[in-house]
Amino acid sequence: MSEFIAENRGADAITRPNWSAVFSVAFCVACLIIVEFLPVSLLTPMAQDLGISEGVAGQSVTVTAFVAMFASLFITQTIQATDRRYVVILFAVLLTLSCLLVSFANSFSLLLIGRACLGLALGGFWAMSASLTMRLVPPRTVPKALSVIFGAVSIALVIAAPLGCFLGELIGWRNVFNAAAAMGVLCIFWIIKSLPSLPGEPSHQKQNTFRLLQRPGVMAGMIAIFMSFAGQFAFFTYIRPVYMTLAGFGVDGLTLVLLSFGIASFVGTSLSSFILKRSVKLALAGAPFVLALSALVLTLWGSDKIVATGVAIIWGLTFALIPVGWSTWITRSLADQAEKAGSIQVAVIQLANTCGAAIGGYALDNIGLTSPLMLSGTLMLLTALLVTAKVKMKKS
């Protein structure tokens, strides 16, 4: 309890938000997301240049996610009392190094090393994002600051693939990663200029990461996080075959649907701080319930293009509340161990993404076209019920 009080006293001492630092963190996160998904739009030229198949080249994305999962779990135990400012600078350096290694890769092995560097930065940065945010702004401003960071994520997710595809045709895939390295250098300088000293955890406050799961409501929260993200990836990973077959969209129509989804996600993220100020628990229970209903509507009436488009927009708008909401939950309910809680959260999300996509794919191949929707809807409904019944929430 003394640790919790000490942490909150430190937070209360922040009377004015450091928006420059918040935006530097948001920019760095956006760069990480863009670089994570660049290979998706550059697989063919990368594979041809390196003399490998597109399937093998695609493992560069898998390696990043795999390394990120483990990095998120162990980063806080590794860095311990190190000033977080230097740690964030290191992550920006790893981002830049990753881009350069990929750009100059003449073998698949070097490509994987470069992508592993990105995984270290990605997992570590995500694990620390909530705790960094709560140390840069006053407590009541944390949801707004988190919405800025996740808004940057939404923008990055929308532009990553089309930007990579366009620039790849224009300047070649290697120069695309060189340009990304230049963004990494900008991240380094912006962080050095704006991020204040953020001392690490004193030795007497060290606590085993997984002991946090013994606290009331924490295990339920992590299970809810797992189910909500698994439900998201069970649906979104297979949105192309579902929408093209069930609703009859062509490639151009699907592109517009995905763009609408991305814009709705950005709008939802932008509005999330206002909703979360009213009730974090209501948002975390209400959002998956709306998504469960959306999955049901799409399953029953998804052959209508207007209905299918409407569901995509509602889904993007609503799901945007979930990542911001759970990060806000950590900053409020686990404020004394926000870094360690963030580590577990990121690992759970990475595992959920993998499981959701894998099980959704199995269901699609072996049960039927709408089975990923039913799986997603079921997981979202269970999430809403679990949050309502078991997840504990501290007031700000």
Swiss-Prot record:
Record GO terms (molecular function): antiporter activity; purine nucleoside transmembrane transporter activity
Membrane topology: Multi-pass membrane protein
Top-level division of the source organism's lineage: Bacteria
Family classification: Belongs to the major facilitator superfamily. DHA1 family. NepI (TC 2.A.1.2.26) subfamily.
PANTHER family from the UniProt entry: PURINE EFFLUX PUMP PBUE, PURINE RIBONUCLEOSIDE EFFLUX PUMP NEPI
Record organism: Escherichia coli O157:H7
Topological domains, Cytoplasmic: 1-21, 76-85, 129-147, 197-215, 277-281, 327-343, 388-396
UniProt cross-references to InterPro entries, sorted A to Z: MFS, MFS_dom, MFS_Efflux_Transporters, MFS_NepI, MFS_trans_sf
Chain ranges on the Periplasmic side, renumbered to this chain: 43-54, 107, 169-175, 237-255, 303-305, 365-366
Catalysis: reaction(s): inosine(in) + H(+)(out) = inosine(out) + H(+)(in); guanosine(in) + H(+)(out) = guanosine(out) + H(+)(in)
Localization of this protein: Cell inner membrane
One GO cellular component term noted in the UniProt record for this chain: plasma membrane
Function noted in UniProt: Involved in the efflux of purine ribonucleosides, such as inosine and guanosine.
Protein name in UniProt: Purine ribonucleoside efflux pump NepI
Principal subcellular localisation of the protein: membrane
Transmembrane segments: 22-42, 55-75, 86-106, 108-128, 148-168, 176-196, 216-236, 256-276, 282-302, 306-326, 344-364, 367-387
Higher taxonomy: Bacteria, Pseudomonadati, Pseudomonadota, Gammaproteobacteria, Enterobacterales
Keywords, sorted A to Z: Antiport, Cell inner membrane, Cell membrane, Membrane, Transmembrane, Transmembrane helix, Transport
